Amino acid sequence: MKHLAFGFALMLVLAGCGGETSGSRSVSASGFSPLNAPFHYEGWLLQTDNSNVTRWVSFGKFNVDAQGNLVKLAGGPFEIESYGPNRGSTTYAKISIENSQVNSTPSASTLLAGPVTLGESPLSATDVQAFGTNFVGATGTFRLETPTASPVNTNGLSGAWFRNSALGASLNLPTLPSGWRYQAWATIGTVTVSMGRFTAVTSADSGNPHKGPGVAPLVPGEDFLAAAPGGLTFPLTGSTTPMSLIGQPIFVTVEAEPDPAVTPSQYVILRGVAASGATVGSSVVMSNQASGKFPTFSLTVF
């Protein structure tokens, strides 16, 4: 998903009723990316009705166009559809990723959230209703090796696994809430290839379609030995371009589940590149990329 930054502001006057206080609310946002249909973003407000039942009420579905403008699903500039029948009781807001245009409750894929109060109410990925973390403490390494080759480590610079020299898990990542998965990727030449989706760093990932005949380790990773996608030849050897994973970016993203795209999201958490001179068994330190990767959204009530 291509990262597109945008800004907008909407001013809406809400008429007070049933003892509610009249007021104006402005909405501002930036850093969202377009989602492939039928996926879209949706805003929600947590409200309590006259029967003291608390529920999430939608304030509109939206997406982002190629120019970075916030748009309604049917086209045209996004406008708040409704603040719900009990807007005066609103205490919380969140933005989710949805894959159905007919839904009465939010999906598990909450991207941003935060309490709503008088004044500015920013929604954040760090809120407990969203991820509960900014991911900037995440760390990791990967090891160049091909444990599924026969013999082991044949074409050993054609594989990358998230384990250390003691063969233990080498990623330190926050636990994700329901509705999200990590996914590892390798950009080999000009082609970005999935290395699998996972939630636990001490378990196998979602699959290893490019591995050799051997058994894969119980950690995320991939051997690029077989079933190469178009534009590549596996294994990566001295006669292929590129010749190995040296110089090829390996990175980890956060992806919605289900996923709006087969390409990496903008939410890149870790990235590493094996330097020239790396050998089979070398561990490569990954740098944290999380800062600024998540969008912002805020409500201002005054």
Kindly give the residue locations of the regions a language model identified.
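Hydrophobic helical h-region of N-terminal Sec-dependent signal peptides
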Residues: 6-10
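N-terminal targeting/export leaders
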Residues: 17-302
